[in-house]
């Protein structure tokens, strides 16, 4: 389709991996060029589409949501980015009334959804906005939807993610707004995110009780994650390696709209094959499910690189309808 088709579309999907190590860890020159080109192409497509509303699906990495109360999904009527790593801090331009209206709509459809009136988000949300609209995150109105991707057993299953996306889509059908749905996360990766199985009780406490880390604690975490990425790149890491085959199959499903096949996927196989944090890829599934399923949409932007130093199977994909 021509570029003008983007400008006349009513709904668009952007799947975009995130990595807090972008700009911190070294990346091979050809990989960096590919990432920069993909992000630039996505930014150009998004600005040509000119969304009037954004629905942003993202995970958290124990910066805003903790195990003391961890919902599978949560809509924010107000949201602030904490500014971890190189991501910007500050308030998101949240469409508060529409966020509450979406929650009402989902509840009426028997999809129980949590609501936060003071959501804190990290790079899992803000990096996509930063790359598309700059450090000031001067965006169109946003409805942020958090998705738990780290804390079992409350990680939503595939079919539930698809159902949420369909519910969001039916809500958007009632609005005369050009809407961009962003899934921020994935693809295959297993960064050093602790779990409640960690042997150190202090670590278990840190991921359970809500707290604000000190600047020193943030710096130590950044250095720890940077070292993990370098170890993975050098092949001497305990972390699960990236899985480009899994990633490309996931992107193929997004492109074709054949989402029922993903819903039939064995849940345990996700972590086993693609790493524990590959559950973040479900943000793509929710966003894609708000567009017509079983339909191959126009896809002017698609790029992928497996980059161990970033601990990321890094994919970017833009489609419109």
From Swiss-Prot:
EC number(s) stated in the UniProt entry for this protein: 1.13.11.16
Keyword Iron attributed: yes
Alphabetized Gene3D superfamilies for the sequence: LigB-like (3.40.830.10)
Pathway: Aromatic compound metabolism; 3-phenylpropanoate degradation
Positions of the catalytic residues: 123, 189
Disulphide bridges: none
Cofactor(s) this protein requires: Fe(2+)
Keywords, comma-separated and alphabetical: Aromatic hydrocarbons catabolism, Dioxygenase, Iron, Oxidoreductase
GO molecular function ontology, one term from the record: 3-carboxyethylcatechol 2,3-dioxygenase activity
EC top class named in words: oxidoreductase
InterPro entries: DHPP/DHXA_dioxygenase, Xdiol_dOase_suB
Domain of life, source organism: Bacteria
Catalytic activity, reaction form: 3-(2,3-dihydroxyphenyl)propanoate + O2 = (2Z,4E)-2-hydroxy-6-oxonona-2,4-dienedioate + H(+); (2E)-3-(2,3-dihydroxyphenyl)prop-2-enoate + O2 = (2Z,4E,7E)-2-hydroxy-6-oxonona-2,4,7-trienedioate + H(+)
GO biological process: 3-phenylpropionate catabolic process
HAMAP family hit by this protein: MhpB (MF_01653)
Entry-linked NCBIfam families: PRK13370.1-4
Function: Catalyzes the non-heme iron(II)-dependent oxidative cleavage of 2,3-dihydroxyphenylpropionic acid and 2,3-dihydroxicinnamic acid into 2-hydroxy-6-ketononadienedioate and 2-hydroxy-6-ketononatrienedioate, respectively.
Family designation: Belongs to the LigB/MhpB extradiol dioxygenase family.
Subunit description: Homotetramer.
Protein name: 2,3-dihydroxyphenylpropionate/2,3-dihydroxicinnamic acid 1,2-dioxygenase
Organism for this UniProt entry: Comamonas testosteroni
């Amino acid at each position: 389709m021509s570029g003008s088709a983007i400008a006349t579309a009513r709904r668009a999907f952007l799947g975009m991996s995130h990595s807090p190590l972008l700009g911190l860890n070294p990346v091979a020159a050809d990989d960096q060029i590919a990432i920069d080109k993909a992000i630039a192409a996505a930014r150009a497509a998004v600005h040509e589409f000119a969304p009037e509303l954004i629905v942003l699906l993202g995970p958290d990495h124990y910066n805003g949501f903790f195990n003391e109360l961890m919902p599978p999904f949560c809509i924010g009527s107000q949201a602030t980015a904490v500014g971890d790593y190189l991501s910007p801090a500050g308030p998101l331009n949240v469409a508060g009334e529409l966020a509450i209206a979406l929650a009402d709509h989902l509840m009426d459809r028997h999809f129980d959804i949590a609501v936060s009136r003071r959501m804190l988000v990290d790079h899992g949300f803000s990096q996509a906005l930063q790359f598309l609209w700059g450090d000031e995150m001067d965006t169109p109105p946003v409805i942020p939807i958090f998705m738990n991707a780290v804390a079992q057993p409350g990680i939503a299953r595939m079919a539930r993610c698809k159902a949420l996306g369909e519910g969001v889509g039916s809500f958007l059908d009632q609005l005369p707004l050009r809407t961009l749905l962003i899934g921020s996360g994935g693809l295959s990766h297993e960064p050093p995110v602790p779990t409640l199985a960690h042997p150190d009780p202090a670590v278990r406490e840190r991921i359970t009780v809500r707290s604000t880390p000190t600047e020193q604690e943030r710096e130590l975490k950044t250095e720890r994650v940077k070292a993990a990425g370098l170890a993975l790149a050098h092949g001497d890491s305990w972390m699960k390696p990236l899985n480009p085959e899994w990633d490309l199959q996931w992107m193929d499903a997004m492109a074709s709209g054949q989402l029922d096949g993903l819903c039939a996927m064995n849940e345990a196989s996700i972590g086993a094959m693609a790493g524990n944090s590959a559950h973040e890829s479900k943000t793509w599934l929710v966003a894609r499910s708000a567009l017509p399923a079983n339909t191959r949409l126009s896809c002017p932007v698609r790029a992928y690189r497996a980059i161990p130093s970033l601990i990321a199977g890094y994919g970017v994909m833009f489609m419109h309808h």
